[in-house]
Amino acid sequence: VDVSQARKDISADAAGKTFSIATVVKVDGIAWFDRMRDGVKQFGEDTGHDVWQVGPSQADAAAQVQLIENLIAQGVDAICVVPFSVDAVEPVLQKARDRGIVVIAHEASNLKNADYILDAFDNKAYGDKLMEVLGKSMGGKGKYLATVGSLTSQSQNEWIDGAIAYQKEHFPGMTLATERLGGGE
């Protein structure tokens, strides 16, 4: 990605405005998203923008949609979202975009109603690497389990899809013991 033309100073002072930016996570109160909250807070401190993070207390697509509805009603400038279910958030994110709210998504490569989609890495390549390490550790033989945070988690399912495809090609002596399991995020 060529970022040479990307704006470097994104502070409220440089923009001449303080933007309100909400991050909506899959579920509040778990370590992964607690760490994300630290980054959201740091971004606010670094730039002067009004930023915060919210999420449902349990992994619940309807509760996440309601949080986004509330943010639309508040008139935020941007919503950053890690969807629990891409299908569930599509309509409400379209509504946000129709109202001029910028939508930025993470862990949702197939989301249609986003202005930007950011992922940390290539999901298939990540799955390939997971299986490469597992396959070598198992000597290329035996049964294994595949788990995801939730069965609706797009990125994690892409990891597992990549891993299974890699296993079939490189470790035919291995088999998936059961369908992938969801851990409830």
Label each region the model flagged:
Residues 1-185:
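A residue-level marker of the well-folded mature domains of exported/periplasmic proteins
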